[in-house]
Amino acid sequence: LKAGTRIGPAQAGTLAALGVVQVPVFKPWKVAVLSTGDELVRIDQVPGPGQVRDINTWALSCYVKKTGLELVSAEAVKDEEVLLEEKIREAVKACDLILISGGSSQGKKDMTMEILNRISKEGVFTHGLALKPGKPTILGYDKEKHTLLGGLPGHPAAALAVFHLLFVWLWKQVTGQPDQPPLEAFMTTNLAGAPGKTTCLLVKLQMAPQGLEAEPVFGKSGLISTMAEADGYVLIDMNQEGLKKGEQVKVYRF
């Protein structure tokens, strides 16, 4: 078994057949998920005017577990600076990675960057990525606690995309896990890029006479249904004008 191999039933059986009782493994990161917003209500509640169900806590928690990381805590927090800072400070003490969805933009209630920078003693090194969706992303590191800090967009599809593109990728790099090879497919339509931004385009795959076709899944980054409908994504380079119908592209799976 090579370094970076995830131990599943077949791998465990192979080790047993060889009489190997113990093997060195990577300790999973401990992760805390915090979703911020006064508008968030529990998923078993009926949202009132100006309210939405708390999607990100559940979706991100599921993705954390799928990645093989240890979910320590997950909860929604109101847009109250003192309360949010208290929750983040508690999480930093116990976790290797903190994910905060929402509050990463530039509005009056968007206080995540300021709090993270204060807690980590100027540890925030990025506020804003040339990525669509995902522009308001915050990245930081607490040197004292050795904790990664991630401020994700509040929109569900954008939050999941940023987690996948940055933190799942980083975990695989640290542990030596090989990337899943992309699929080759042909675009079903012309699509313009976003000048100055790398675009993460959600697509669904369908079989055609000439091979796999990639059909864009259109929808706003706040619609989690777009992520559920997609089979993967195509990356459009920031210097690329766009994609043409029939153009061959690489489709990466989640």
Task: Map each language-model feature to its residues.
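Short glycine-rich anion-binding loops that position phosphate/pyrophosphate groups of nucleotides
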Residues: 38-39, 103-106, 154
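Short, glycine/charged-enriched hinge/interface segments at domain edges or termini
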Residues: 1-73, 213, 218
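Flexible glycine/proline-rich
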Residues: 115-254
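A general structural motif
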Residues: 52-57, 78-84, 127-137
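A generic local secondary-structure boundary/capping motif
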Residues: 3-4, 19-25, 88-89, 127, ...
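Generic structural signal for buried aliphatic residues
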Residues: 1-2, 7, 98, 243, ...
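N-terminal small/polar loop signature for handling phosphorylated ligands or for N-terminal nucleophile
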Residues: 61-119
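Residue-level signal for inorganic ion chemistry
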Residues: 33, 64, 99, 203, ...
